From Swiss-Prot:
The keyword Protein biosynthesis applies. Consists of two distinct domains, a catalytic core and a N-terminal extension that is involved in tRNA binding. SUPFAM superfamilies: Class II aaRS and biotin synthetases, tRNA-binding arm. InterPro entries: aa-tRNA-synt_IIb, aa-tRNA-synth_II, aa-tRNA-synth_II/BPL/LPL, Ser-tRNA-ligase_type_1, Ser-tRNA-synth_1_N, SerRS_1_N_sf, SerRS_core, tRNA-bd_arm. Homodimer. The tRNA molecule binds across the dimer. Keywords: Aminoacyl-tRNA synthetase, ATP-binding, Cytoplasm, Ligase, Nucleotide-binding, Protein biosynthesis. This is Serine--tRNA ligase. GO terms for molecular function: ATP binding; serine-tRNA ligase activity. Catalyzes the attachment of serine to tRNA(Ser). Is also able to aminoacylate tRNA(Sec) with serine, to form the misacylated tRNA L-seryl-tRNA(Sec), which will be further converted into selenocysteinyl-tRNA(Sec). The keyword Aminoacyl-tRNA synthetase applies. Its main location: cytoplasm. ATP binds at R268, R269, E270, E355, I356, S357, S358.
């Protein structure tokens, strides 16, 4: 949520910044409501002052045993009018808040302008054969898609997933299930052992307050799964419960920075994705992801974004998977982000890069919604923290990338070296 003081004092600048996102942002309704609020607030304050003065004078007359009936008549007129205006003021404040919570974050000055994916800017790429700046290696034979490989090896069963649950669900079998678990454990060990993250195992059910805090509600409710009889939602990402661990808290400066990682199931309705990625694991209603969350001091958050993005990239380097990193343009960023890097892994079967991680700095946007603060000194004034999050990385998409990049001409798949200790020493699948 944006700072209302900033919107009030820099309305034109905020409007211009939000228009960089490509939408038609018009803060005229905010301006009108604020103007009406100020007018009513002035009258409320005048009536409150009048009421206080009358109360004092009535008390004085009573003490002097003098008639105060005229003052009581005035008080009877002031009271109802004041109550009426206070009710109108509360309604206007609610309308202003509704406008503010619907506004996305403003893009950072370093974010390139643009309307969509085509305007994102590549900042680097890597491949195991070419290193930094290297292009993906050529397999030397016609690459298959991961669903062909997985079905042929008997490790991915899409028909069983559809029978058990419906479309966009998959059953992982045997070595496929073990490979998925191996990937997640490798990521967790890397992040906790080398990158300094604390492992968290959060609930996969959450409440509306937490989803509001991280920005999924109220705008994106249609993409969430909700329990029928209770006010619980299935988490769309571990970002929600993990970031909300600091909700309504005032942290001590010594507690920062906080780095947390979690491996969870994630659940998304994928509203608006009809016809997209209908085959395979790329777009599922249920999927596994290792999430990275950092809670930082404001002045550190952009350096932290580079760090967090590097941690996600390191997962792919360890797996020997070619990737590129792009900075999202202003029109392609998520609702709460001020700056985002997408990491896209190379998929030979599709002949293109696909997103496997999205790493964002939300600055104080989520913190303001969550009331998450810290003190620099023991008795210092609380300040909002900055929150960052990113996939470290999506487990299912990592499995897709392993199957497609490590496939052999005979249909077998080589197990990446870093995964072999998690696979009982298995070197090849098939």
């Amino acid at each position: 949520m944006l700072d209302i003081k900033r919107i009030r004092t820099e309305t034109d600048a905020v409007e211009a910044a939000l228009q960089r996102r490509g939408g038609a942002v018009d803060l005229n309704a905010f301006r009108a409501l604020e103007g009406r609020k100020r007018t009513i607030q002035t009258e409320v304050e005048q009536l409150q002052s009048q009421r206080n003065t009358l109360s004092k004078e009535i008390g004085q007359r009573k003490a002097a045993r003098e008639d105060a009936s005229d003052l009581f008549e005035q008080m009877q007129r002031v009271g109802p009018r004041l109550k009426e205006l206070e009710s109108v003021l509360a309604e206007l404040e609610g309308q202003v808040e509704a406008i503010i919570v619907a506004l996305p974050n403003t893009p950072h000055s370093s974010v390139p302008d643009g309307l969509g994916e085509q305007d994102n800017v590549e900042v680097r790429r890597w491949s195991p054969s070419g290193g930094e700046g290297g292009d993906p290696q050529v397999l030397g034979f016609e690459a298959k898609n991961h669903w062909e490989i997985g079905e042929a090896l008997g490790i991915l069963d899409f028909e069983a997933g559809a029978a058990v649950a419906g479309s966009r669900f998959t059953v992982f079998k045997g070595v496929g299930a073990r490979l998925s678990r191996a990937l997640a454990n490798y990521m967790l060990d890397l992040h906790t052992g080398s990158h300094g993250y604390q492992e968290i195992l959060p609930p996969v059910l959450t409440n509306a307050e937490c989803l509001f805090g991280t920005g999924q509600l109220p705008k994106f409710e249609e993409d969430l799964f909700r329990t029928r009889d209770d006010a619980y939602y299935m988490i769309p990402t571990a970002e929600v419960p993990v970031t909300n661990l600091v909700r309504e808290q005032i942290l001590e400066d010594s507690q920062l920075p906080m780095r947390m990682t979690a491996w969870t199931n994630c659940f998304r309705r994928e509203a608006g994705s009809a016809g997209k990625d209908t085959r395979g694991l790329i777009r599922q209603h249920q999927f596994d992801k290792v999430e990275l969350v950092q809670i930082r001091r404001p002045e550190e958050s952009y350096a932290a974004l580079e760090e967090l993005t590097g941690h996600a990239e390191q997962v792919l380097k360890g797996l020997g998977l070619p990737f590129r990193t792009v900075v999202l343009c202003s029109g392609d960023m998520g609702f709460g982000a001020s700056k985002t890097y997408d990491i896209e892994v190379w998929l030979p079967g599709q002949g293109k890069y696909r997103e496997i991680s999205s790493c964002s700095n939300t600055e104080d946007f989520q913190a303001r919604r969550m009331k998450a603060r810290f003190r620099r000194e023991a008795k210092g004034k609380p300040e909002l923290v900055h929150t960052l999050n990113g996939s470290g990385v999506a487990v299912g998409r990592a499995l897709v990338a392993v199957l497609e990049n490590y496939q052999q001409a005979d249909g077998r798949v080589v197990v990446p070296e870093v995964l072999r200790p998690y696979m009982g020493g298995l070197e090849i699948i098939g």
